Amino acid sequence: YQLESQEGFVPFSVSEIEQRVTVTTGSKTVVTL
């Protein structure tokens, strides 16, 4: 799993990725599976 945001690489747990496909951290975040 790889997440790309304006702040750079943001690591997330696999279980969190499975629960939500789109993660919003206050900035534009794109989730690529």
Swiss-Prot record:
Keyword Lipoprotein in record: no
Known role: FABPs are thought to play a role in the intracellular transport of long-chain fatty acids and their acyl-CoA esters.
GO CC terms of this entry: cytoplasm
Gene: fabp2
Presence of the UniProt keyword Cytoplasm in the record: yes
Main location, first listed in the record: cytoplasm
Protein family per UniProt: Belongs to the calycin superfamily. Fatty-acid binding protein (FABP) family.
Phylogenetic classification of the source organism: Eukaryota, Metazoa, Chordata, Craniata, Vertebrata
Protein name: Fatty acid-binding protein, intestinal
Subcellular locations according to the entry: Cytoplasm
Organism field: Rhamdia sapo
Entry keywords, A to Z: Cytoplasm, Lipid-binding, Transport
